[in-house]
């Protein structure tokens, strides 16, 4: 409990309990006047009937309440529904790369390699040595995410749920949907699982903030395409731990890092689709779709972004900017590469920047 202008008041462990009446009596004894108080509650799920207790403070004009928790009860969008219109949800992401570099003892090049391998969960970042980091990630996955997801959602086929996680981990940034995943189970795992069950598991992963989905958006038609979607991990360290650090594929890992950074900055992020019709050498018209990796929106601001791990030659550059040249509007278009290049605009007004500048300077895409 924190009173403006005074020191933090520690609630002693022996006075903490799950009895809501005792808890509320203790708080009342500490709120001594009409000053502004802040109630900071960690692991709120340990308190019985905590929803009712928290709602009881709604009419207290001199009290703001902040709650956190790591249990299945809180790793859920149901909490936002429970307090809809009566509170604000703050989504706490792992450390951004800029935050990571504040504690990393090395240069940004080695830093990004480690960040893409072990992620930005503070508990893991502060561990020393590869083995300790890997062990911490494995423990988080098994003891927090898997346990809480299966417990809260009453998952019986835990093996299928873990198989689905492995499939998603091996194909980050790939377009997929429950029907495609069902076929993968049938051909690769030799097992039968319904698309409805797969959708339920995907929703469980998203509700626990383990993954996020990016929906496809028809840029010309200005309409969303329901399926398929792309899935990105909220922390790459968790993704890599899931597959025992066997597949460290930098192209899609960089794409995942860019996606997470954009979400941390507050953008909504979609996958852009541009339907086109072209004639082949025989004069036959063929229809195809070009893709823009990210369509980023925040209010009236929009950016189109391509993630290109490397631009070794002009052919590759033309390939990356081709979708941009089919977009009729004037919103800014950006290519992000891992190549060490100075920020520059080409003859089409397309900005190219390197991944380090993008991650370390939140204003670089505005310049």
Q: Where are the model-predicted features located?
A:
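Catalytic P-loop NTPase motifs of RecA-like helicase/translocase cores
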Residues: 8-10, 44-48, 74-75
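Structural recognition of the conserved hydrophobic beta-strand(s) that form the central parallel beta-sheet
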Residues: 40, 64-70, 91
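A cross-kingdom feature that marks ATP-driven nucleic-acid transaction machinery
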Residues: 197-204, 209-367
């Amino acid at each position: 409990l924190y009173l403006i202008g005074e020191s933090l008041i520690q609630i002693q462990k022996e006075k903490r309990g799950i009895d809501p009446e005792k808890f509320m009596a203790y708080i009342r004894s500490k709120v001594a006047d009409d000053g502004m108080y802040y109630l900071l509650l960690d692991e709120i799920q340990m308190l019985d009937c905590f929803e009712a207790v928290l709602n009881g403070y709604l009419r207290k004009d001199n009290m703001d309440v902040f709650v956190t928790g790591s249990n299945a009860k809180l790793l859920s969008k149901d909490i936002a529904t429970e307090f809809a219109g009566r509170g604000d949800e703050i989504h706490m992401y792992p450390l951004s790369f800029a935050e990571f570099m504040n504690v990393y003892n090395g240069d940004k090049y080695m830093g990004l390699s480690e960040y893409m391998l072990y992620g930005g969960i503070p508990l893991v970042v502060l561990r020393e040595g590869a083995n300790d980091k890997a062990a911490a990630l494995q423990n988080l996955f098994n003891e927090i995410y898997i346990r809480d997801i299966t417990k809260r959602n009453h998952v019986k086929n835990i093996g299928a749920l873990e198989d689905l996680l492995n499939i998603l981990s091996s194909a980050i940034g790939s377009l997929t949907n429950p029907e495609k995943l069902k076929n993968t189970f049938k051909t690769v795992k030799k097992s039968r699982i319904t698309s409805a069950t797969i959708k339920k598991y995907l929703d469980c992963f998203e509700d626990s903030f383990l993954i996020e989905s990016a929906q496809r958006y028809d840029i010309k038609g200005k309409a969303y395409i329901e399926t398929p979607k792309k899935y990105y991990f909220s922390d790459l360290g968790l993704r890599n731990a899931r597959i025992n650090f066997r597949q460290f594929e930098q192209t899609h890992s960089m794409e995942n890092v860019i996606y997470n950074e954009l979400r941390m900055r507050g953008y909504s992020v979609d996958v852009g689709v541009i339907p086109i019709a072209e004639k082949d050498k025989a004069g036959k018209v063929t229809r195809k779709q070009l893709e823009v990796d990210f369509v980023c929106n925040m209010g009236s601001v929009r950016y189109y972004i391509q993630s290109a791990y490397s631009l070794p030659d002009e052919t590759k550059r033309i390939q990356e900017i081709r979708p941009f040249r089919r977009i009729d509007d004037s919103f800014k278009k950006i290519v992000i590469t891992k190549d060490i290049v100075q920020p520059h605009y080409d003859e089409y007004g397309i900005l190219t920047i390197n991944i380090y500048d993008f991650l370390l300077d939140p204003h670089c895409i505005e310049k």
